[in-house]
From Swiss-Prot:
Organism: Streptococcus pneumoniae (strain ATCC BAA-255 / R6)
Disruption-associated phenotype: Over 1000-fold decrease in transformation efficiency.
Gene from which the chain derives: comFC
Family statement drawn from the similarity comment of this UniProt entry: Belongs to the ComF/GntX family.
Domain of life per record: Bacteria
Transmembrane segment boundaries: none
Written domain comment of the UniProt record: Oligomerizes via its C-terminal domain (residues 94-220).
Summary of subunit composition and partner proteins: Monomer and dimer in solution. Interacts with ComFA and DprA; ComFA-ComFC form rings about 150 Angstroms in diameter with apparent 6-fold symmetry.
Function: Involved in transformation (genetic competence for DNA uptake).
Name used for this protein in its record: Competence protein ComFC
Length: 220
């Protein structure tokens, strides 16, 4: 099997635990590539997992004042290796890379068995240009289904806006007509920065009747 990132041939090593549990190590990364990604450590904001903090961060305090209780979890930091990954996956359109973190996501998402998964959608133009929704790809590669509840209108890319600009614009997301809103939702995105997108959509779902909305991203 070859590493999906560098193409290096990987040796399959059967460990005692994998034999005992009758499962294979299904990692798509070689050890060299795997070592370039940084897991979020224990020192982080208890609400959004912002690193190198042990108390609620400033962003979460601001969200609290706006009536949003942040309850977010993520796996990795947004280091240079992760930036390079998303450059290839999202912007170069290498859809095969959706499988790179499948085993990591599977381990985390299985903790939310009582929740219905909902992914942050792309606008029609962005979807047409990219050819796929990168979040849907990650979730599907991890072996999970999601509900199609949301749509997004066209707008300027959020990555080109600062926090105040994101909050000052009308929310481009809306709930599709005729759908049933589950009581417990895990809202999933690829990257969490200030939380401007995912927390506003969280509030939208809560106002529509969801009783418990938690948020999740691959990267913080």
């Amino acid at each position: 099997m070859k590493c999906l990132l560098c193409g290096q041939t990987m040796k399959t090593v059967l460990t005692f635990s994998s034999l005992l549990l009758l499962r294979n190590d299904d990692s798509c990364l070689c050890s060299d590539c795997d070592s370039t990604f940084e897991r979020i450590g224990e020192e982080n904001c208890p609400n959004c997992m912002k690193t190198e903090l042990s108390t609620k961060c400033q962003d979460c305090q601001l969200w609290c004042k706006e009536g949003v209780g942040v309850s977010h979890r993520a796996i990795f930091t947004y280091n240079q290796a992760m930036k390079d990954f998303f450059s290839r996956y999202k912007f170069d359109g290498d859809f095969l890379l959706r499988k790179v973190f499948a085993s990591f996501l599977s381990e985390e998402l299985k903790k939310y068995k009582e929740y219905q998964f909902v992914v942050i959608p792309l606008s029609p133009d962005r979807y047409a240009n990219r050819g796929f929704n990168q979040v849907e790809g990650l979730v599907e590669a991890a072996g999970f289904e999601y509900l199609d509840l949301l749509e997004k209108r066209e707008e300027r890319a959020s990555s080109s806006k600062n926090r105040s600009e994101r909050l000052g614009t009308e929310l481009p997301f809306f709930i599709k007509s005729g759908v049933t809103i589950p009581k417990k939702i895990l809202l999933i995105d690829d990257i969490y920065t200030t939380g401007a997108t995912i927390n506003r959509v969280k509030k939208l779902l809560e106002e529509a009747g969801a009783k418990d909305v938690k948020t999740f991203s691959l990267v913080r």
